[in-house]
């Protein structure tokens, strides 16, 4: 059982004349039960908590800054590599050709010397044959020289007349020529002695012309003689009928 101790103090109050009693009781507890409440003071850790939070935030900010710097460095390196690759692909120099590359690489270029003496207008006097471009590329960046390698010789300009190849079907014929050739050829039925320039034959031709003139005169005389009833005189044309190639109209007339 709990024991209670009570202290009673009697004090006299002179002002009011009344008696006041003050009691001070404090229980004496020697055994703690399970139902008894235990009050513990809450520790104040405000300083420690704020310091830990600030350090944690600063650590996170530091990590974020490191990540951002790493990302920026990677982007800068990627940009530098891209620019270097573009510069290497666009620039042609001897240092690029000395690097070991693959056989079928587009940067692999074989040098073929044009002449033993370098050209005064060319930097190196060499031309590069690019397998990927299938053309000659000058190492100095200038257009290639017109003189090519004998192995890869080809004409750059040719005459348009020489470039025309004969047709497989045969030579072309014009319309007028085809019409002339389509007509059948007629054999020449006259004498070819008229084309000769022999003086003896020319005299025969002159005599034949005289005979023709005489035949016209004799035909007129024969008509007159038939009208008068006298026999015509023998014309000198009859003696030359055997030698003349022409046939007179008097021979064909009925007698």
UniProtKB/Swiss-Prot annotation:
Per its UniProt record, what InterPro entries does this chain match? PBIR1/2/3
What's the protein here called?
PABIR family member 2
Q: Which GO terms describe its molecular function?
A: protein serine/threonine phosphatase inhibitor activity
Identify residues that carry Phosphothreonine.
Answer: 112
Skewed-composition ranges (Basic and acidic residues): 174-184
Residue numbers of Omega-N-methylarginine PTMs: 122
Q: List the disulfide bonds.
A: none
Q: What gene name is listed for this protein?
A: Pabir2
Modified residue annotations for N-acetylalanine: 2
| Record has Acetylation as a keyword | yes
- Superkingdom of source: Eukaryota
Positions bearing Phosphoserine: 25, 33, 50, 58, 115, 119, 145
Keywords of the record: Acetylation, Methylation, Phosphoprotein
**Family of the protein in this entry:** Belongs to the FAM122 family.
């Amino acid at each position: 059982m709990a024991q209670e101790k009570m202290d009673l103090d009697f004090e006299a109050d002179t002002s009011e004349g009344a008696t006041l009693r003050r009691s001070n009781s404090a229980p004496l507890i020697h055994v703690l039960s399970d139902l008894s409440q235990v009050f513990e003071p809450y520790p104040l850790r405000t300083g420690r908590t704020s310091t830990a939070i600030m350090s944690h935030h600063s650590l996170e900010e530091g990590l974020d800054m490191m990540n951002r710097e790493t990302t920026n460095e990677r982007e800068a390196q990627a940009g530098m590599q891209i620019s270097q690759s573009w510069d290497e692909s666009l620039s042609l120099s001897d240092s690029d050709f000395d690097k070991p590359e693959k056989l079928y690489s587009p940067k692999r270029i074989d040098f073929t010397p044009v002449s033993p003496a370098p050209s005064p207008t060319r930097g190196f006097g060499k031309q590069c044959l690019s397998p990927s471009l299938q053309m000659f590329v000058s190492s100095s960046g200038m257009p290639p020289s017109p003189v090519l390698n004998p192995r890869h010789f080809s004409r750059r300009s040719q005459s348009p007349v020489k470039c025309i190849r004969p047709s497989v079907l045969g030579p072309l014929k014009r319309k007028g020529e085809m019409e002339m050739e389509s007509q059948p050829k007629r054999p020449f039925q006259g004498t070819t002695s008229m084309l000769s320039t022999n003086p003896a034959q020319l005299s025969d031709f002159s005599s034949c012309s005289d005979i023709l003139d005489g035949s016209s005169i004799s035909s007129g005389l024969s008509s007159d003689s038939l009208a008068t009833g006298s026999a015509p005189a023998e014309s000198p044309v009859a003696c030359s009928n055997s030698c003349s190639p022409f046939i007179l109209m008097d021979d064909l007339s009925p007698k």
